[in-house]
Amino acid sequence: SNKEFKDSSELLNTLPFYTGHAQIFITSVDLIIENPLIGKGIKSYRNNCFSIMHLPNRVCESHPHNYFLDILNDTGFLGLGLILVPVLILLLRVYKEYLKGEARNNNISNWIYLAIILSVIIQFFPFKSSGSFFSTFNSAYTFLIIGFLLGLNEIRSKSDK
């Protein structure tokens, strides 16, 4: 069909997979651009989004509904690095331990490792819509998984000695 749209939000609303998160993401990216290095402060999205509501396709919500956008908006690239670098280092170390475990044929331990690694990857999957990273429930769940991973890694490294 040759239907013309007044603005891109009209077009977005016609897409079968559109959930409305695109507008939240656009708003979040606009706010990140304003202060990319250190962000605007924890849980600041809900207060700062009103400043750009006059632009098309912008929506004000309580948080950006994506961990990466949430962290970038609140703490900037500096905060994202401080959060992601240790998590990535941990995942690499644990993955190396997981590979060592395959050689030892310790199947239960390997399945636990794999489940925890996948939980962390799924939790931080960049394109999924999520709650606020800095909310109590989401942070508790994330750091609980990371704690399990650290504990399991410590147990495995001690058993190798």
Name these PLM-found stretches.
Residues 75-124:
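Hydrophobic transmembrane alpha-helices and their immediate junctions
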Residues 9-34, 38-75:
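Long extracytoplasmic/lumenal interhelical loops at the membrane interface
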Residues 38-41, 58, 81, 133-137:
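Short, hydrophobic secondary-structure boundary micro-motifs
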Residues 39-43, 76-79, 115, 147:
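Glycine-centered flexibility sites
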Residues 50-54, 99, 130, 149:
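A generic structural signal for secondary-structure junctions
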Residues 11-13, 63, 105-109, 128:
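Short coil/turn segments at secondary-structure junctions
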Residues 86, 114-161:
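Transmembrane alpha-helices of multi-pass inner-membrane enzymes
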Residues 1-6:
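Aromatic-rich transmembrane-lumenal/periplasmic boundary elements in polytopic membrane proteins
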